[in-house]
């Protein structure tokens, strides 16, 4: 939250499974489209929040499987854990708040006699969350009985049912909605309330997000029955909540445009040749550079000299690139070598994407961008900590040039993708 000196232009708070992440999309296209949009347009002045029912263990597993961005804030375990930044620093104040009238041992003891409840794996059992599987046909009766039992014990607990099988018991003050309300209050107390907040979900444990006053909301097209039922009963007349006709992250992109919260055209949706922008935005230049790099190697742009010419037009004739292995090459020589790589990743589930992009202005017309550059092929991925220098150059066709690219390996991600980091 400290990355912004003032209010976020936009704060997106999104569920992960079947909302931000489409498990039926093997190419992860909608997720990558959102990532490119966020890094090119919003990363400098907005906040990205992931709100998931997953425990930290399963959340980290998902990040290894999918081309996800690093969020500014992560809400996990159905709103019982809040962490900040890449290091996932926990919010101790939130944990202390949840201890009120909560005794996990009593919850476990009082639910053991319900044969309909099957404990979820140990990784999903958290200090402020006890999680079970329950058949849909038994869910409502079990919820009622468990609630009565816990109430008699003097516990102030909440029961959330979602996904047609997941039953979570939490402190009454917990949940995705309460966690978001806590964050909004915390931002407001620092004088940084977001200008706009967009919440995004698909299942019952997301319903609370849509109940927070003033937020915009999108239920993705693949939203589950329990969330649609909640919407019909509680929010069908609220113009700030829509049911998208697009799946998962594509629905989030659609909602940004529907509510006029900002640009919603992803660099991945642009056709080459790119139109020259009216004003130069370094983040946009970096993201477009690597989107085109990926499309060249996947043979998703024509095999044309115009692509190689574009790369040379936006790179300095004397510029250099330093490979993670330490090899220093001319930028233009690297682009010439890229010409022979056209289509070498076609049909191989290859992707390249930018994460954690941060721009520093170093002069009146110069910038340095620092970011993680990921390349993946199937289940294998590599990552370099990258820096890229740009300067305005009015006489160049695009109005700017890249002068220097340098990469170093991210620990644990230094090998596996053949011919990685050509640029």
Swiss-Prot record:
**Nucleotide-binding as UniProt keyword:** no
Keywords carried by this UniProt record: Hydrolase, Magnesium
A single GO molecular function, which one?
A: sucrose-phosphate phosphatase activity
Q: Name one GO biological process term.
A: sucrose biosynthetic process
Which coenzymes or cofactors are required? Mg(2+)
The enzyme's first-digit EC class, named in words, is hydrolase
EC numbers listed for it are 3.1.3.24
Q: In which pathway does it act?
A: Glycan biosynthesis; sucrose biosynthesis; sucrose from D-fructose 6-phosphate and UDP-alpha-D-glucose: step 2/2
* Substrates-to-products reaction catalysed: sucrose 6(F)-phosphate + H2O = sucrose + phosphate
- The regions listed as transmembrane in this protein's record are none
**CDD domains named among the record's database cross-references:** HAD_SPP
What Pfam families does the entry give? S6PP (PF05116), S6PP_C (PF08472)
Q: Which InterPro entries match?
A: HAD-like_sf (IPR036412), HAD-SF_hydro_IIB (IPR006379), HAD_sf (IPR023214), NTF2-like_dom_sf (IPR032710), SPP-like_dom (IPR006380), SPP_C (IPR013679), Sucrose_Phosphatase (IPR051518), Sucrose_phosphatase_pln/cyn (IPR012847)
Gene3D superfamilies in alphabetical order: 3.10.450.50, 3.90.1070.10, HAD superfamily/HAD-like (3.40.50.1000)
Q: Which NCBIfam families does UniProt cross-reference here?
A: HAD-SF-IIB, SPP-subfamily, SPP_plant-cyano
User: PANTHER family recorded for this chain?
Assistant: SUCROSE-PHOSPHATASE 2-RELATED
| Protein family per UniProt | Belongs to the sucrose phosphatase family.
Q: How does it assemble?
A: Homodimer.
Q: What does the protein in this record do?
A: Catalyzes the final step of sucrose synthesis. Inactive with fructose 6-phosphate as substrate.
Recorded protein name is Sucrose-phosphatase 1
């Amino acid at each position: 939250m400290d990355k912004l000196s003032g209010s976020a232009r936009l704060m997106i708070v999104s569920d992960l499974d079947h909302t931000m992440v489409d498990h039926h999309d093997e190419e992860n296209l909608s997720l990558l489209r959102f990532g490119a949009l966020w890094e090119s347009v919003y990363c400098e002045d907005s906040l990205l929040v992931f709100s998931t029912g997953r425990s930290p263990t399963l959340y980290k597993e998902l990040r290894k499987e999918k081309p996800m961005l690093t969020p500014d804030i992560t809400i996990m375990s159905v709103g019982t854990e809040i962490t900040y930044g890449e290091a996932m620093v926990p919010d101790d104040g939130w944990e202390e708040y949840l201890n009120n009238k909560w005794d996990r041992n009593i919850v476990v003891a009082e639910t053991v006699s319900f044969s309909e409840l099957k404990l979820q794996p140990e990784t999903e059992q958290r200090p402020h969350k006890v999680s079970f599987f329950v058949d849909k046909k038994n869910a409502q009766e079990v919820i009622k009985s468990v609630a009565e039992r816990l109430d008699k014990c003097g516990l102030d607990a909440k029961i959330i049912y979602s996904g047609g099988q997941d039953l979570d018991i939490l402190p009454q003050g917990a949940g995705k909605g309460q966690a978001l309300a806590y964050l909004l209050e915390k931002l407001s107390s620092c004088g940084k309330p977001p200008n706009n907040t967009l919440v995004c979900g698909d299942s019952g444990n997301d319903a609370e997000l849509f109940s927070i006053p003033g937020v915009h909301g999108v239920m993705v097209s693949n939203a589950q029955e329990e969330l649609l039922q909640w919407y019909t009963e509680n929010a069908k007349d609220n113009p700030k909540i829509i049911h998208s006709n697009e799946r998962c992250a594509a629905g989030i992109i659609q909602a940004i445009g529907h509510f006029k919260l900002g640009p919603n055209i992803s660099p991945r949706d642009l056709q080459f040749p790119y139109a020259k922008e009216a004003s130069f935005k370094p983040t946009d230049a970096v993201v477009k550079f690597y989107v085109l790099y990926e499309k060249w190697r996947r043979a998703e742009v024509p095999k044309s000299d115009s692509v190689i010419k574009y790369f040379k037009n936006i790179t300095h004739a004397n510029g250099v690139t330093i490979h993670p292995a330490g090899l220093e090459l001319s930028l233009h020589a690297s682009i010439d070598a890229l010409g022979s790589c056209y289509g070498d990743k076609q049909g191989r589930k290859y992707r390249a994407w930018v994460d954690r992009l941060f721009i520093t202005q170093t002069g009146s017309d110069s910038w340095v961008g620092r970011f993680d550059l990921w390349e993946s092929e199937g289940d294998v991925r590599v990552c370099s900590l990258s820096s890229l220098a740009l300067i305005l150059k009015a006489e160049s066709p695009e109005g700017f040039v890249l002068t220097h690219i340098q990469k170093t390996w991210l620990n644990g991600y230094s090998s596996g993708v053949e011919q990685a980091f050509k640029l």
